[in-house]
Amino acid sequence: MKNSIFLIPFFFLVIGCSPVERSVGFTTWSDDGTELKYHLGTEASISVVKKFDQLLQEKNYTELNQIFSDTAQFIYHNGVRNSLNEFINLNIRRDSSLAANNETLKWEPQNVFSVDLDPSSGGEHVNMMYLATYESPETKSQFYANLWLYVLNGKIVRVNQYNQSIEN
């Protein structure tokens, strides 16, 4: 009887301490159009995206291969798609043009979060918002860059980027 008395509170303690997996909202991003809910993602995927930002800030394009899948795609607001090599070449040309014209383009991360649509299958959607500042000898402008990155097994598979002008 004594054992039963001690087991009952222990049982409730174990049940009461079990984490409840929360999910909210909906999306039809699944392969077959099935409606899924959002779950919190992980710091591991956010760390991959922060590494991406760090490498871009440092203009260290050679190490990007370490955090991107072999089939990675970059998709822009106008539907243009680039491979990783095309993305790197685009950045090198941009950097050269900016330097030649005494211009700068700097960006600061504003927020980042990760959501998981199906925790049983792997892969997370990470959102990172930047405030970008372009400066030339004659002008200064800012815009927001909103990136959605799909991270699977520690590698970035896809980057979708949308920009929003900031009116002065």
Please describe what each predicted stretch is:
Residues F87, N91, P109-F113, A145-Y150, ...:
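Hydrophobic/aromatic beta-strand elements that line small-molecule binding cavities or substrate pockets
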Residues S18-E58, T62, Q66:
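Short, low-complexity N-terminal intrinsically disordered segments enriched in polar/charged residues
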Residues S18-V24, Q142-N168:
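Short beta-strand edge/turn micro-motifs at domain boundaries
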Residues F52, E63-N65, A72, F87, ...:
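Hydrophobic pocket/interface hotspot
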Residues N91-P137:
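Surface-exposed, charged secondary-structure patches
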